[in-house]
């Protein structure tokens, strides 16, 4: 069960956490992006470049992931698709999405899109904090531990 990373928007510090975990646990990590990526030399870490275009990287992740795989993404619609396929979705802030929470997130995302379309400034997310990084690492470790027990 590999880790799939929506790499175009994934913070560098989160990629570094993933790289260390890949080496430590011998878990495949596949970064998917529509631009060239630099990854450390490793038999466990791969970069997959897809053509530029709307949702091309997302569609590649949905096509390739399987039940039980981990997908790291902040993209709510992508998270919803991989959850529907049986994969686990984790955002870079360490929030693990579930079928229940992803519906709520999709509704909020659609509402915010409507506000932005009407000209209301909604602002962006806060900068990634140390607490966010720790939460991400903890959730990643939980998934990796569960993967080990299943093997």
Curated annotation (Swiss-Prot):
Domain of life of the native organism: Bacteria
Annotated family: Belongs to the UPF0178 family.
Family annotation (HAMAP family): UPF0178
NCBIfam families xrefs: PRK00124.1
Protein name: UPF0178 protein ESA_02916
Organism expressing this protein natively: Cronobacter sakazakii (strain ATCC BAA-894) (Enterobacter sakazakii)
